[in-house]
Amino acid sequence: MAAARGEFAAHGYEGTTLRGIARAASVDARLVHHYFSGKDEVFAAVMEIPARPQELVMGITSGDPDGLGERLLRTFFSVWDTPQGRERVIALISSVTSSESGARMIREFLTREIFARIAAVIGVDDPELRASLAASQMVGLMMARYVVRLEPLASADPEDLIPFLAPTLQRYLAGDKD
């Protein structure tokens, strides 16, 4: 994991490869592939994200497109709204706000591995813009709820938040521009 952390820090998410990680760790690339199906899983392990990104995206994108925003939020809260998840959110946000390399890694990961995949699956126009809008909403939620602890948002039950947040995410991801 130290070699992977070093590669992500030096090259960002986009510039890091599984072969580069293997080289830095002085192991055969097949060993890395044995434990991780892709770069997204290595990054999730390095950042201690308690879920597999591909599984999250599959769960979010399966089902009726009209429920996309709600499924995104339910998935988000199931991963992050636990004591362990909150600690990891705070660590992620800290890395984003304290260094450009941390910000670049998180930005590239969120846009490429989560939100761009969601937008691509639903086949909408301007998928990159939509992905970044959805990511901005979710990063803002993470910051306000877990880091700043803005009340009553910080202590609200997720079920009370979903009806307010889901329509905005739905419009960002799948709604009309008009």
Regions found by a protein language model. Name each.
Residues 76, 89-96, 134-138, 142:
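Short alpha-helical scaffolding segments that buttress acidic/His motifs in well-ordered protein cores
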Residues 27, 75, 91-92, 117:
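A general alpha-helix detector
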Residues 3-41, 45:
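Helix-turn-helix
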Residues 48-53:
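Short, basic, alpha-helical segments at the C-terminal edge of helix-turn-helix-like DNA-binding modules
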Residues 80-103, 107-108:
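Amphipathic alpha-helical segments used for helix-helix packing
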Residues 55-89:
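Hydrophobic alpha-helical connector segments
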